Amino acid sequence: MARKEKNDYFQMIEEQVAHARDAAWLLNEILTDFRPNELPANRARMHEIEHGADIKKHDMMEKLIREFITPIEREDLRDMSEEIDTVTDLIEDVLNKIYIYNVAKMRPEALEFAALILRSCDDLVAIAQRLGDFRKNREEIGHGTVSYTHLRAHETGAYL
């Protein structure tokens, strides 16, 4: 009898977070060295990252549907995956809005905001890397979550 392949959901989460971080890095790079004439090519690069993230999310959802037992609640895994995908989608949306509104010059506040997004995604990467052994890494995950939440609050303040 063929042995059933084990699904590593925490690895899948980590891969999704890597896509969000790649998108944040690309956004930061584009805004730091802003060249409006390169926006179409940069949007295509960003869309490749976002599409890769969508594929990872869909793969995980397919596996969750078929899996009988998961390491944590199925709904929690689904919610994490959806939220991470939303982060990646929203990062892509920033670049799309810059293109749609024909932005010609980047304001310093936008650069600060892009750097905050990148730092937030770095925190998500650190958290995701520890999820595989969440019982052992409970404290580090907690600290990472607090740091991420603090950055999110700062982002909200910077945006308003």
What are these regions (language model features)?
Residues T149-T156:
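Conserved small/polar residues in nucleotide/adenosyl-binding loops
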Residues A24-E38, M60, L64-F68, V94-K105, ...:
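Secondary-structure edge/capping motif, primarily at the C-terminal ends of alpha-helices
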Residues K6, R35, D79-E82, T156:
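Intrinsic-disorder/low-complexity, polar/charged segments
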Residues V17, R21-L31, E50, K57, ...:
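A structural signal for well-ordered alpha-helices, especially hydrophobic packing surfaces
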Residues P40, H47, D59-L90:
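Hydrophobic/aromatic-rich structural module bridging two neighboring secondary-structure elements via a short loop
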Residues M1-Q11, T32-A44, F68-E75, I98-L111, ...:
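Short, charged, low-complexity loops and linkers
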Residues M1-G52, K56-M60, L64:
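Leu/Val/Ala/Ile-rich N-terminal alpha-helices, chiefly Sec-type signal peptides and the beginnings
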